[in-house]
Each structure stands twice: as structure tokens, then as C-alpha cells.
Regions:
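Class I SAM-dependent methyltransferase SAM-binding "motif I" and its flanking Rossmann-like core
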Residues: 177, 181-225
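Glycine-rich N-terminal segment of FAD-binding domains in flavoprotein oxidoreductases
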Residues: 67-99
């Protein structure tokens, strides 16, 4: 997509620019499709990104509605949550273009919280109306939702009737534990529409929208597995790397009540539609040499050899001919190199990713180094989605770049204001009260008391929270020698400032802010968060904005010497098969990095949106980098205390 306008029109993030360059892998061949999918128990379509997958599902829905000739409305089952949002927007777009009508369609929502009213913004009823139904020509009498307002004594009768009519096409998503709707772990295959108790994990996932776990419903009404199985046809969707682990179990694992979505393997007409992130742990993606012929590039060869080392528990240079043959890598031995030459080549390839000079070592032979020695010093921009991602995810490298004399700038893309507890604000204002600003403390206390669960926070409170996070970020970079007054940039990208968990789509205004910074600094190196999995969604939006900005500046003279390095956040790390640069950290550098993370006091201990990992961010960061160092050591490299790794996008 090329930008041709300066308007603030929303950018379609599904049509993503963010995809790592393809480098080797399974050879696509229609004739071999049955072979390459032989581990999969459900017909599965893998698309490069959500945009392509959504279009495929939308094509199927539009075609099914158009082909429906019965005298009753076409019955369409709708899933809820984040997964279908892109699909609903695409269906609205097609309706507006005159490609589909919903006048003869009846919809059935998969689930609803209980108790809840349709007017509450967190209800499934409200969200599906907001995203789809309010924008198309569906008849009100054809809209069906579980009724979250019914008295308990009326629910059994309601549930006995709900969703048991003929459903022509059922669209479902999959929860991170394999839930379909609110069919939790342990659900029986014969379950029907019913009231269910929500698990702690499900309530925790939903708690952000409700303003905390204490405000999140403990129950829900959901179609059961048996109800879903009665649909004529089912399409299951999943997007993003955070769904990869569960989708591998749903698609390739045994049918089990521990993964309720796996029951759908037994449906006679089901299809799974996922993007490459959600497919990343399928056998044909993770270990494609087990299923078919491959293109053996140097980096793909490294991926296979690193995997083999893990299987046989040996370092690279100890792998034998038999190790390759007995673990389905015979094809690699047929590419013109002996096994020991492959070992040496991969060892050298991986070793050459290691450097203590992330900005390039001046006056040194750089023929095998990941970064050129010239120019020196380099102009560098570190993009940080939230005000602490820079030090959490690449703090050691950041410190090295500063201490080695480069002109380093850090750009905090969002304010991070919603991730500050109210108590933290009151604590800061209490200090102000001690200094004589009693009126201000009282005002803030009133603002906090006026908040309503699930509604956007008051702007005055968000401004205070943003100020707290800016002060913490300045303190962190000051701790290792960066001047925050000249080299720390708080972009406050507008898309983030919704006041709630759900952010606005990014627009040209966001892109223009990043473009200006790029042209001001003219960086030789750009570091950006390349997370494919992010419980907030902010990281993904931020990398898309950076890439859109790069599209604008790529014709500038300075850009020809620029390279983009991707780091990962506090959730996952790059696979060693894809790493382009590895920066080792000494024990002292880990302490300096940890102390920088400590400066983000509002994010210590308990934070509003911690994800599933109970550890503090500094602990996650250290465990992640120390695990990477151990992986390098296990492969036969030098033993380091910790290593931060990066992938070069260009």
C-alpha cells in the first residue's frame, strides 16, 4: 500500500506491511499439498496475514449468502472477541460497495456475558452491533443474542431454544486455552447452550474491558459444543503468534476436553483459516523438513541444524552423519556439502551474529560482522512502543550504543498512560500535598472517584499518568548517560489516546509524526519492537506506523545507508535460526540495565495489564536474555551471562 494522501483517514492495519522476509522453507507445490499437511486433522488454510485470511472468509460468507435460495433467512453464527473484528469491518465494506445484502440473513451470537445489558459497551450485543449490525441492512427480528438480562429462573427455557435452529454457517474463534465461545477446559462434547461459570483465566483476559477483575462478570451464556457441531458448516479463525501454541493442538493434536476446540475435528465440514503467526507451530511451518522438500538457504539451513542440536542434545560441531539421517534431514545432505562442512558453515554463520559493537566497531575488519564499521559514530533511533520497552527489551544494547559514542535518540511512541494505577497517581499527588499543593491533590482524588468501570479515563487523569511515565523514562535513560532533554522524544501518537484499552485505528497524523523524527535525525540504524505477539496490540500498531513512515522517507538520500533492526519484547524471543545480530552482556551490564528498568516505578510489582506472566519485567527480561545465552553456549559458542538478539528487516 502506497500512501498518496495527507488526510487523517484510518489506515487498514490488517493489510500489514509487517512480515519478516522469507528465507528458504517448504517448497510450495499443489501436488504435494496432501503430503505437507499430513499431520493436520482439520483442513487448514494458512495466509500470510490477517488481511488475506479475512478476505477469504468474507468471500465464503458472501458467496454462501448469495447462493442461499430457501424461503427462510440464511442463518449465520457469529463469534465474539477480537478475532472477528477485521472480518466484520470487511463485511461492512462489502455491504457499502453493494456486494452483499443482509436483508435475508439471521445472525446468532455464540455467547454473551451474564448478567449484562445490551447497552453496556462490554456486552457482546453492543460490540457486534457497533462493528457490524448497525452498518448493514439486517432486519431487527433476525438478530439473536443470548439474553444477559433474563432472571436466572428463565434461563433454562431460553437456553433450550437458543441456537438449536438450523445454522447454515458458523464462524468461530479460539481462545488461548482452546475455548470456543465460553466452552472452557473440561467441556463435554454433548454440551448445549447453557449458563456457565467463567474460569479465572477467562475473566482475567476480559478484565481490561471491564476496568478490573472485580468488575468482570463471573458467568456467561454460551452455545455448547453439540450446538456448534449441528451447524451445516464451520469456519474457525485465529490470528497472531499468541494463538500458535493452541492452534497446533487444535489442528494436529488429539480430540480432548482439555482443548474444547479440538472437538470440531469431528465436524464433517469444517475449515480452519489462520495467518502465518497463528500457524507458526504447525509441523509444516516449524519443522517443514519433516513433511516435504525444502529450499535450503543458509539461514534456513541454520534453522534446521539448530533444531537438530536440540533433538540430539549436541553442539553443532559434534553432529554426525547419522544424526542428520535419523532425524529427517537426509535431503540437506543431498545439497552438495558433507555433514561436517554443513556443521562448520552453520557454526561460523551463527558465530558471526555475535558482536559487542552493535553500532559497528571503528577501524576494524567488518567482513564478517553484522554491522559495518563506517560511518562512525552513527545516528541511531530506538523506537519504544511504551515508555519502558526500550530498556526492558534491548537495554544492554541501548547502553552499549550510548557508551560507544553513537548519536542515540529514543522515541517513545505512546504515552503509556493507561498502564498506571490510580494509586500511583495519588501517591505522587500526596507528595505534592506535602509540598503545599493541597488543592491539586483534592482535585485528583475527586477525578479518581468519578471514574466508571469500563469507560474511558478522564483526560485530566490520563495527563497526570502520562507525565509520570515520561518522568520515569527520562530518569531511566539519564541513568546510563543519555541526555533526555535533547535525545528523548515523546511522540504521544494519537491512535493510543482513546482513554481505554481499545485503541483507535492509526491515521496519517501518526505516520507524519514519525516521518518528521526520521527526517530530523536521519538515522543509520533504526531499532523497533518487532513483536508478532502482544497482549495489548500496541506493539503491532507501532511497528506498522514505523513501516508506513519508512515508505514515505525511503527515497531520501540519507535512507540508502539506513538499516532496520527488530527486537522483541518481554513475551517472546527470536528463534536462533532467524537472528542476525546477538549482543552479549556482561554481569555488570545486566545490573546497569536492571537499574534502568527499576526507574519505571509505576510498572513494578503490580501493573494494570501484565499479561499471563506474573514475573516483574526486569525478571522476564533477564530470564529471556540468559536463556538465549545458554542456547548459544549449548550450540558450542562462548558462554556469556546474557545475550540480546535482533533480526534485520533491511
Amino acid at each position: 500500500m502506497t500512501l498518496k494522501t495527507k488526510t487523517n483517514k484510518n489506515i487498514n492495519i490488517m493489510n500489514s506491511k509487517y512480515a519478516l522476509p522469507k528465507d528458504g522453507g517448504l517448497i510450495a507445490d499443489v501436488a504435494l499439498q496432501e503430503l505437507t499437511q499430513r499431520f493436520e486433522r482439520i483442513a487448514t488454510q494458512v495466509y500470510e496475514n490477517e488481511y488475506d485470511g479475512v478476505n477469504y472468509v468474507a468471500d465464503n460468507i458472501v458467496a454462501a449468502i448469495g447462493a442461499h435460495k430457501a424461503d427462510r433467512p440464511f442463518a449465520l453464527g457469529l463469534t465474539t472477541g477480537k478475532t472477528p473484528l477485521g472480518l466484520y469491518r470487511e463485511l461492512v465494506r462489502r455491504y457499502n460497495k453493494g456486494e452483499v445484502s443482509f436483508a435475508n440473513v439471521a445472525v446468532y451470537s455464540l455467547d454473551e456475558f451474564y448478567p449484562i445489558t445490551p447497552a453496556e459497551a462490554q456486552s457482546r450485543n453492543y460490540r457486534i452491533h457497533e462493528e457490524l449490525l448497525d452498518h448493514v441492512d439486517i432486519r431487527p427480528e433476525n438478530i439473536n443474542f443470548p439474553d444477559g438480562t433474563l432472571p436466572r429462573e428463565q434461563l433454562s427455557k431460553f437456553c433450550a431454544a437458543y441456537g438449536h435452529n438450523k445454522i447454515d454457517l458458523m464462524i468461530v474463534g479460539v481462545g488461548e486455552d482452546g475455548q470456543v465461545g465460553f466452552n472452557e477446559i473440561g467441556t463435554h462434547a454433548n454440551s448445549k447452550t447453557r449458563l456457565v461459570q467463567l474460569s479465572y483465566q477467562s475473566r482475567k483476559v476480559q478484565s481490561g474491558a471491564f476496568g478490573g477483575l472485580e468488575n468482570t462478570p463471573k458467568m456467561a451464556i454460551t452455545m455448547g459444543i453439540h450446538t456448534i457441531m449441528k451447524a451445516d458448516r464451520v469456519i474457525m479463525m485465529a490470528w497472531g503468534e499468541d494463538k500458535a501454541k493452541i492452534m497446533s493442538r487444535v489442528i494436529e493434536g488429539e480430540v480432548t476436553s482439555q482443548v474444547p476446540a479440538s472437538y470440531l475435528q469431528n465436524h464433517s465440514d469444517i475449515e480452519v483459516v489462520i495467518d502465518e503467526g497463528a500457524a507458526s507451530q504447525l509441523t509444516r511451518v516449524q519443522t517443514p523438513w519433516l513433511v516435504g522438500p525444502c529450499q535450503w538457504t543458509p539461514k534456513f539451513t541454520r534453522k534446521a541444524v539448530v533444531w537438530l542440536c536440540g533433538v540430539v542434545k549436541k553442539p553443532i560441531l559434534k553432529l554426525t552423519y547419522q544424526d542428520y539421517l535419523e532425524n529427517s534431514l537426509g535431503e540437506l545432505l543431498e545439497q552438495g556439502r558433507t555433514y561436517d562442512q554443513i556443521n562448520i558453515d552453520v557454526f561460523n554463520d551463527l558465530q558471526h551474529t555475535i558482536t559487542g559493537w552493535p553500532g559497528g566497531k571503528p577501524n576494524a575488519d567488518d567482513s564478517t560482522r553484522p554491522v559495518k564499521s563506517t560511518p562512525f559514530p552513527k545516528n541511531v533511533i530506538v523506537f519504544s512502543p511504551h515508555p519502558d520497552d526500550d530498556v526492558i527489551s534491548m537495554g544492554g544494547t541501548f547502553i552499549r550504543l550510548v557508551q560507544q559514542g553513537h548519536n542515540v535518540h529514543v522515541a517513545y511512541e505512546t504515552s503509556g498512560n493507561v498502564a498506571v494505577h490510580d494509586d500511583v497517581v495519588l501517591q505522587h499527588m500526596d507528595a505534592a500535598h506535602e509540598l503545599g499543593f493541597a488543592d491539586e491533590f483534592a482535585k485528583v482524588e475527586e477525578i479518581v472517584k468519578s471514574k466508571k468501570a469500563g469507560e474511558p479515563e478522564p483526560r485530566a487523569l490520563l495527563n497526570l499518568k502520562g507525565a509520570i511515565r515520561r518522568a520515569e523514562a527520562r530518569s531511566a535513560v539519564r541513568s546510563f548517560g543519555l541526555n533526555p532533554d535533547t535525545n528523548a522524544h515523546f511522540l504521544n501518537l494519537p491512535f493510543y489516546e482513546s482513554g481505554g484499552i481499545r485503541k483507535n485505528p492509526f491515521t496519517q497524523a501518526d505516520i507524519d509524526i514519525v516521518v518528521k523524527l526520521l527526517r530530523d535525525v536521519k538515522p543509520h540504524q533504526i531499532y523497533a519492537a518487532g513483536d508478532l505477539s502482544d497482549p495489548h496490540g500496541t506493539h503491532r500498531t507501532c511497528i506498522e506506523i514505523v513501516l508506513e513512515a519508512i515508505e514515505v522517507v525511503k527515497g531520501d538520500e540519507w535512507f540508502k545507508d539506513c538499516h532496520l533492526w527488530l527486537y522483541r519484547g518481554a513475551w517472546m524471543e527470536w528463534d536462533l535460526g532467524s537472528v542476525d545480530m546477538a549482543v552479549p552482556l556482561s554481569p555488570n551490564e545486566i545490573i546497569v540495565k536492571r537499574h534502568a528498568i527499576y526507574r519505571h516505578l509505576s510498572q513494578k510489582d503490580i501493573v494494570p495489564f501484565p499479561g499471563d506472566d506474573p514475573r516483574e519485567f526486569w525478571q522476564r527480561s533477564e530470564d529471556r536474555t540468559q536463556t538465549t545465552a545458554k542456547q548459544y553456549n549449548d550450540l558450542g559458542m562462548a558462554e556469556y551471562q546474557a545475550i540480546e538478539v535482533f533480526v534485520r528487516m533491511f
